[in-house]
Amino acid sequence: MVKVSFKSVFFLFWPFLFFSGTLFALPQKAPDFDLQSPQGKLSLNQLRGQVVLIFFGFTACPDVCPISLSTISRVFHQMEEEEQQKSKALFITLDPERDKVEMMQEYTGFFHSNIIGLTDTAETISEVAQSYGVNYQKKKLERSALGYVINHSADIYLVDSSGMLVKRYPHDVEPEVLVAKIRNLLGH
């Protein structure tokens, strides 16, 4: 019989306690995707030459999603117009059942015009989320008009203008941190 102490198990797994999604080495080539935007299909490769922030969530999210999108909005408001023209943010839904293209456009419009809402089939969204290490799960809500919510990891991904995934930030990152990194990537 092998005895395993709590300490040995804890020290083996402790690094994973502080990350909300799957771990992967950075920088690395950002996984490309082809999702529905208000203007038709949009791939990450189409945004080459721009710095891109990516956040996964859903429009009925009561807390972390609007807070994260507000943070991203504040990032754009702190940037010069020229910097804004060289950057975008993508809000990828984890709830394609409810979040249709029109809903995504209306929702992201509340935050900033540089934020593009993306949706697609549940299968496609699952593949994209998995490629970014996003964990999510549908949870039924008894006695709620919503019927369900999506529990999900909540990182903000930063992709440079050459398509490299360079950094992953927690959802509560200060906007100034993102602005400084984007400016650095833009050479300002």
Residue ranges and their predicted role:
Residues 28-30, 47-51, 84-89, 99, ...:
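Extracytoplasmic
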Residues 45-68, 72:
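Short active-site neighborhood of thiol/selenol oxidoreductases, capturing the structured segment around
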